[in-house]
UniProtKB/Swiss-Prot annotation:
Protein name: Uroporphyrinogen decarboxylase
Associated pathway: Porphyrin-containing compound metabolism; protoporphyrin-IX biosynthesis; coproporphyrinogen-III from 5-aminolevulinate: step 4/4
Binding site for substrate: R23, Q24, A25, G26, R27, D72, Y148, S203, H321
Location relative to the cell: Cytoplasm
Similarity section: Belongs to the uroporphyrinogen decarboxylase family.
UniProt-listed GO biological process terms: heme biosynthetic process; protoporphyrinogen IX biosynthetic process
EC number: 4.1.1.37
Catalysed reactions, semicolon-separated: uroporphyrinogen III + 4 H(+) = coproporphyrinogen III + 4 CO2
Gene: hemE
The organism's place on the tree of life at top rank: Bacteria
Main function: Catalyzes the decarboxylation of four acetate groups of uroporphyrinogen-III to yield coproporphyrinogen-III.
Location, primary (coarse class): cytoplasm
The species this protein was found in: Chloroflexus aurantiacus (strain ATCC 29366 / DSM 635 / J-10-fl)
Length: 355
């Protein structure tokens, strides 16, 4: 059953819980490090043959139930005119950040089929090698992309982003509308290139209060999902939405319109599922640090998550964030094998949904 992941996204019965892992292709793998010695990070992302090879590494090494394209959330911003580099020890840097309404007004229109064509080519290459195993495309969400564009890189306080929201609301919503259109176009292009599902990463949205998420973000994320569904109709593949520290935003997140909602490790899976509603599938939610623990602890934590899911159709096992750089490869393999061998209960539990 090579479609377990897609069936779980649609809350259909499966013979076992599917598993894939965010950042499953990464520095913890020696195969990845060997390639990284020869290429810069952006060079890897922008070279379709290399991105395809890296995408396939964890599929070949661990037998995960889905591949996710090797890419990054920020390169689509280059099409708008933002200048992006990755600095050693510093991460991504945007050299002309957005700081004024004028900066928003001069952003270019772009077609991701041209500006991010390398990722679409990589998707096509990977698709040919998967023999029916699902392939996941992805993008950053409008809020997270806006935050990077305004902060000029990573941030802990999001001070510039929040000030821009509060002080320049018209320019903020203009920016978010532009990014919503960009992300919709990009994800549709990925689907047309072969993606069987798409994930929207809202890595920083957990920094917002529910009131601010409703006022400044929700409608733009909804518009993104609605645009994909309107343009693709009945052939729209599963849409996954993921962010960290989102437990306080459950009432808002359940309104986005995604098929699958990602859950991080800061909340029990059954509690999150009840809050999100059982009309959604859920994905998660092992703490990535658990993979540094002995196998007995990995098994105990994974078993707890699987028992909380209880065999209810619609659970995809994943981490609550990406795999960390120094993670032992054998522990990743152990986790995948444990989840794939864990028997589903005969009947799903009766859980009370939070209204």
């Amino acid at each position: 059953m090579r479609d377990r992941f897609l069936r779980a996204c649609r809350r259909q019965p499966v013979d076992r819980t599917p598993i894939w892992l965010m950042r499953q292709a990464g520095r913890y793998m020696p195969e990845y490090r060997a390639i990284r010695e020869r290429y810069g990070f952006l060079q890897m992302v922008k070279t379709p043959e290399v991105a395809a090879e890296v995408t396939l590494q964890p599929v070949q090494a661990f037998g995960v139930d889905a591949a996710i394209i090797f890419a990054d959330i920020l390169p689509p911003l280059e099409g708008l005119g933002l200048q992006l580099t990755y600095e050693k020890g510093e991460g991504p840097v945007i050299h002309n950040p957005i700081r004024s309404p004028h900066d928003v007004s001069v952003l270019r229109s772009c077609d991701p089929r041209e500006t991010v064509a390398y990722t679409l080519a990589a998707l096509q290459l990977v698709k040919r090698e998967l023999n029916g195993l699902p392939l996941i495309g992805f993008s950053g969400a409008p809020f997270t992309l806006a935050s990077y564009a305004i902060e000029g890189g990573g941030s802990r306080e999001y001070r510039l982003t929040k000030r821009f929201m509060y002080e320049q609301p018209a320019a903020w919503h203009d920016l978010m509308e532009r990014l919503s259109r960009l992300v919709a176009d990009y994800l549709i292009a990925q689907i047309e290139a072969g993606a069987d599902a798409v994930q929207i990463f809202d890595s920083w949205a957990g920094a917002l209060s529910p009131a601010d998420y409703r006022a400044y973000v929700l409608r733009h994320t909804q518009a993104l999902v609605q645009t994909i569904r309107a343009r693709l109709g009945d052939v729209t593949p599963p849409i996954i939405y993921f962010g960290t520290d989102m437990a306080g935003l459950a009432g808002e997140v359940r309104q986005i319109g995604a098929d699958v909602l990602g859950v991080d490790w800061r909340i029990d899976l059954d509690v999150a599922w009840a809050q999100y509603g059982f009309n959604h599938a859920v994905q998660g939610n092992l703490d990535p640090m658990t993979l540094f623990a002995p196998p007995s602890i990995i098994a105990a934590r994974a078993r707890d998550i699987l028992e909380r899911a209880g065999g209810r159709p619609g659970h995809i096992f994943n981490l609550g964030h990406g795999i960390l750089t120094e993670t032992p490869v054998d522990h990743v393999r152990y986790l995948v094998e444990f989840v794939q061998s864990y028997p589903l209960p005969a009947t799903a539990p009766v859980l009370q949904e939070v209204v």
